[in-house]
Amino acid sequence: MKRIRLVDLPLIIKIGFAPAFALLMLAVMAGGAILVQKSQSAALKQVVERDMRQNLEIQRISKRISNINGELFVVMTHKAGNIDVDKNDARMAAVLVETDAVKKDLLALKSKLPAEEQPKIAELIKSLEECRSAIDTVSGMISVDFNMAAGFIAPFEEQYVKMTGQLDQVVAAANQRIESESAKRQAQATAAMSVTIIMSLLTLGAVGALAFLTVMTTRKSINDIAAATDKLSKGDNSIDLEKMTRGDELGGIVTALKVFRDNQVHLEQLRADQEKSAALTADERRSKEAAAAAAAQEASLVVSNLAEGLEKLASGDLTFRVTADFPGDYRKLKDDFNAAMGSLQETMKVIAASTDGLSTGADEIAHASDDLSRRTEQQAASLEETAAALDELTATVRRTAAGARQASDVVSTTRGEATHSGQVVHQAVSAMGEIEKSSGQISQIIGVIDEIAFQTNLLALNAGVEAARAGEAGRGFAVVAQEVRALAQRSAEAAKEIKALISSSTQQVSQGVSLVGQTGEALQRIVTKVGEIDALVTEIAASAAEQATGLNEVNTAVNQMDQVTQQNAAMVEQSTAATHSLKGETAELVRLMARFQVGSGSSSYARPAVADAGHHAPARNPVAEQQARLNTFARPGRSSGSAALAQAPASDGWEEF
C-alpha cells in the first residue's frame, strides 16, 4: 500500500485543516461552556426558586404553629384572670381556623418536597390533627369547667413539642439538600473550568503548530521551485528534480521543469552532434550545418520563449503564456509549459481563495470568541445579581431570627409578670386570711358588747324597781334608769345586726379566700406553661439562627460560583487574544500570497489583508466555499453544479451558535 505523504495532499486540504480544526475545537469548547452554564443556572434557579422557598415556607409554618400555641395560652390566661372573657370564643374559633389553614399549607408543601421527605410531613400533619382535636376539646370545655379544660392542655403541649422536633428535622434535611447541591455544582464548575483551560491550550498549540508547518512547508516548496527555475533559465541542467516530485498542485510545475530540462539536455546533445559534423564533407557539412542552424534557430526560439516564461514564473507572474509558434516536436513542450502555467495559476487562485476563507474564518472565530466572552460576562453578572438576592434573603432570615429572639424576650417578660401576679395573688390570699381572722375577733368583741348591753339592761331594770320603791324621791332616778335601759336595748339590737353582718362578711371572705386560692393555683399553672413556651421560643430562635448560618454558607457557595464564572470569563478573553493572534498569522500568509499575479479577480483575494477586523462579513462556512471552488477548478465542464455548490454555504451559517 502506497504511503501518503504530506506533500502529496492538495493545498486546499493542508491550508484548510488548521482553521477547520480550530473551528471544531472552538465549537466543542463553546458548546461545553454553554451546557455547563445552563446546568449551573438551572441548579441555582432550583435552589433559589424551589429549595429556598420551601425552606422559608417551613419556617413560616413553624412560626404559625408557635403563634397558635401562644394564642391558646393567651386565651387560658385571660380566662383565668377574667380579662376580655367575651372575646375568648372568637379567639378560639380563630385558632381552629388557623390550624386548618396550616394543615392545608402542609398538604400543599408535601406534594412539592422530595419523596424521602414526604413521610416527615405526613407525621407532622398527623400530629397537627391531634393538636386540632385537643384544641377543639379545650374550646368546648373552657366556658363550662376551666380547671378541666386546663387539664387538656397537657396533650396539646406534648403534640406541640413533637411537631417542633419534626419541623426541625424537615428544616435540617432541606438545608442539607441545599448544601449538597451547592457543593456538587461547585465541583462541576471547577472541573469544567479545568477541562476548558486544558482544551484551549492544546487547541492553541495544535492550531499554531499546524499553521506554522503549513506556511513554512509551502513557502519552502515555492522557494525551491523558484530556485530550480532560475537555475534552468541560466542553463544549469544538473539540478535533481526527482527530489522535488510531489502530488499536489505544485507538482505540475515540477513536471513542466522536468520537460524543460530534458529539452535542454537534448539541445546540448544537438550541439555536440553539430561539432562532430565538422569532420564530414563540405556538402554534408553544409547540409548538416544548415539543418543544425535551423535546429539551433528553432531551439533558440524555444529557449528564449521558455526563458522568458521561467523569468515571469520566477517573478511571480502566472498569467504569462508562450504564444510563439514552436516547430515540430517543440509544440508539445509549448503546450505542456502553458498547461503547467495554467494549472499553477488555477492552483494559486485556489490557494489565494483558501487564504481568503482562512482569513474570513479567523474573523468569524474572533467574532465567536468575542460573543462567547460577552455571554460569559453576562452570566457572571447574572450570578452576581443572584448572590445579591441571596444576601437579601439571608438578611431576611437573620431578621426573622432577631424577631424570634425578641419573642423569646417578650415571653420571658410575660413569665416574670405572671410570676409576679402569682405572688400578688398569694399576698391577697394572706390578706384575706388576716381579714377573716380580724372578722372573728370583731365577732368576739360584738359578743362582749351584747353581753354588756344585756347586763346594763338588767341593771337598769333593777334600778327602776328600786326607784319605784323609793317613791317620789326616786322618780328622777327612775327616768334615768328608763333611758339607760332603752340605750342598752338599742345597743343590743345594734350589736346583733353588726354580728349578723360580720358573720355574712366572714362567710364571703372565706369564699373569696377559696376563689383567690384557686386563681393562684391557675396562675401557677400558667407560669409553668409560660416557662415551657419560653423554652420552645428559645429553641425556635436557635433554629432560626442555624438557618441563617446555613443560608450564609449557601451564599458563600454562590459567591464561589461567581468567582469561577469570572475565571471562565478571563480564560475566554485569553482564548480571544489567541484567536486574534491567529488572525494576524493569516494576514501574513495573505501578504505572502499577494506576490503572485494570478489574473482577473486576484485583487479580491488580497482584500482580507487590509480589511477592518471590527467589521464582520455575513457569516458563512469558508471551508465549504473553498471546496466548492476546488470542485469548479477540477470539473470545469459542470459550471451549473459548481455554482450550486458555491451558493450552498450561504445556508450553513453558524452565527447563531
Curated annotation (Swiss-Prot):
The keyword Transmembrane applies. Gene3D superfamilies: 6.10.340.10, Methyl-accepting chemotaxis protein. The modification Glutamate methyl ester (Gln) is found at residues 378, 574. Residues 216-269, 297-349 form the HAMP domain. The keyword Transmembrane applies. CDD domains: MCP_signal. The chain crosses the membrane at residues 6-29, 189-212. One of its GO terms (biological process) is chemotaxis. Residues 634-657 are annotated as: Disordered. SUPFAM superfamilies: Methyl-accepting chemotaxis protein (MCP) signaling domain (SSF58104). GO terms for cellular component: plasma membrane. GO terms for molecular function: transmembrane signaling receptor activity. Residues 30-188 are periplasmic. It is a multi-pass membrane protein. It holds the Pfam family HAMP. The modification Glutamate methyl ester (Glu) is found at residues 385, 392. Residues 1-5, 213-657 are cytoplasmic. It is found in: Cell membrane. Belongs to the methyl-accepting chemotaxis (MCP) protein family. Chemotactic-signal transducers respond to changes in the concentration of attractants and repellents in the environment, transduce a signal from the outside to the inside of the cell, and facilitate sensory adaptation through the variation of the level of methylation. Attractants increase the level of methylation while repellents decrease the level of methylation. This is Chemoreceptor McpA. It comes from Caulobacter vibrioides (strain ATCC 19089 / CIP 103742 / CB 15). The lineage of its organism: Bacteria, Pseudomonadati, Pseudomonadota, Alphaproteobacteria, Caulobacterales.
